[in-house]
């Protein structure tokens, strides 16, 4: 039972959110109101989770939107009687924390913990129904010991390996990036630096072992946004095709392999294109060609962020087409990627847009091998023909539909040994090595005798050294820490060195959702029974920018750990909501390209640059310090209260759409809550006194109350929070118009129902008005109301009246009227008499509730 020591003063009509919210947050904490219920056999569970934040030090409005959405869903499910797990933690490792700590000359650990403390206090201001007893940070030793444990589990399963590889190197952050962390312009997703290529020995996870399952199981994710599934589908990039082996004429034992999905065009190949680093290049002896290739390498390096020109360098190498033994020149081309397929592609200019452009530019032959219609005569092509059709100039395959020829040519190649059916993926193994201090150490020892040796699980954790040297704008790498790096080999016992790379931070976030159900377990990363009971996450909320990073890695981890028999689930997240960005007005001078702070603008209704008086363009863009359009959540809460901030965030736009910040809209929600406050203050003064009741008013209120219950329940269930608040407003209008003219039982029932419906959206004021109308326990311990279908039935309906099938009138008919009464009422109406008077009525057909047809 919750009975606060201090009740809010009810002798004022002024709504004071700061006092109300502070009071109730304290009560919730004291009473441990949001502690997760233990699951029983009869429990109906709901696991609600927001993507956990990186502790940057301050909440921004994007955070607020994410956590308020999840909190609303968690509260709603709790009202519906479910055992709810709604935890929070911190994604605490990574370069931003290390760089920020270096700037301040302090340890990343100190910096991170300070930020966590501040952000936690900010989150609590929002009134989130979080079970804080389950909180952890990924930089805690008692968390990353289990990240290391799971690394070793994956190692034992053959999913971890080390190899020398050309990697993406960030020259600003001095670390390796996974392919997914390099944007379309070739820049680091963190620092924005142009990414370089570097050869290093690195640790990888075999995510490609699960490529097919990751792709196929997207079909199971019915409650994921389609665009996220498409992004993952494209990233995995399954291609079903054929590897074709071309002999090299100067060396019959040497072959070049090309992957293609179009073996039907093999007779149209007029050149092969290879990448700048293809192994065949070492067979080129002409110095001029070698220099041209070096120049091309430099061009590609310098223009990673620009649209590349399709440059080609003809070599002296000649391949032999296996289908007709024709010689084919080999070119080095700027558009061929080392990392995709075999680093070589066949050029079919007649039937590929890119190849056509390349051939025209470099005077390469164009050979037409597919026509649209069998009767069509061949002619010189003005553009590539890329549709289906029939083969020509293809020996014994002439006249065959190209879709059939694909299979036949491929089959002939397989039978004759120059082709192999192949499934290929764009997805590459996950590179997890990072060359920085602030990350989870890799539990491997490097021994001169035994090589790379995994530690025994009993030797975990490999803790980060605390005696770090912060100087020269960097934290010395783990390899420079003599006291830390030196150890003994767990296999042979001789002197050895610890692995000095740390893990990609996505290693920590790929399993954190598995830790919450048993976050205090000290003997293993999680209890199998708890995972099988609580997982998958029923509702996951976070940004779409994580579609091909965190979300893909988390799915991989789940499947890999399932195969290690650590639990039985296949997918981690049942339902995914990707919220839109929070945007705010930014003022841009298009002449200078600079953004101007609103505080420097005299008149925001007609904004001009205070320096050159140029008219400023007003743009709604993602909140950012550089654009001077950030809104501090704490200042909004201080001025209007957390409930107002929550209501605005939930009302302004559907959750998956971008939200435009508007002060007037925030004030509108504050006024709405103030009106609710005044109504309940007024009602509380005579809550038990009998007032005169009016049946029509009672009927109206009962109906609006049941409509609200039905619509708000459906809207929250479908993540339509903005329309749910619209229904709340309609119910409030009916409540305020009718509450003083209904019987006392209905009055209390309606006030009680409105309070419960409001509670997931505005949890603090709901607690206070719940007390005002005489209830002692927390409103958040109540059950969600059910609507009464009978109350939604209309007293009357509109009857359409036809004469000989043509509409002549409409009339409101009481539901209780029978057919004789309906006939008597309608046949007297002037609009009907006009068409029936002095005529014989042969038949009257009535479809009750809809239509009446008079046949004359």
Curated annotation (Swiss-Prot):
Annotated motif 'KMSKS' region, positions = 622-626
Q: Which GO terms describe its cellular component?
A: cytosol
Sequence motif: 'HIGH' region, positions? 53-63
Catalytic reaction equation(s): tRNA(Leu) + L-leucine + ATP = L-leucyl-tRNA(Leu) + AMP + diphosphate
Please tell me whether the keyword Aminoacyl-tRNA synthetase is annotated for this protein. yes
- Which keywords annotate this record? Aminoacyl-tRNA synthetase, ATP-binding, Cytoplasm, Ligase, Nucleotide-binding, Protein biosynthesis
Q: Which GO terms describe its biological process?
A: leucyl-tRNA aminoacylation
What transmembrane ranges does the database entry give? none
Please give the InterPro entries that the UniProt record associates with this protein.
aa-tRNA-synth_I_CS (IPR001412), aa-tRNA-synth_Ia (IPR002300), Leu-tRNA-ligase (IPR002302), Leu_tRNA-synth_edit (IPR025709), M/V/L/I-tRNA-synth_anticd-bd (IPR013155), Methionyl/Leucyl_tRNA_Synth (IPR015413), Rossmann-like_a/b/a_fold (IPR014729), tRNAsynth_Ia_anticodon-bd (IPR009080)
Q: Which family does it belong to?
A: Belongs to the class-I aminoacyl-tRNA synthetase family.
> What name does this protein carry?
Leucine--tRNA ligase
Task: Show the taxonomic lineage.
Answer: Bacteria, Bacillati, Cyanobacteriota, Cyanophyceae, Synechococcales
Q: Gene encoding it?
A: leuS
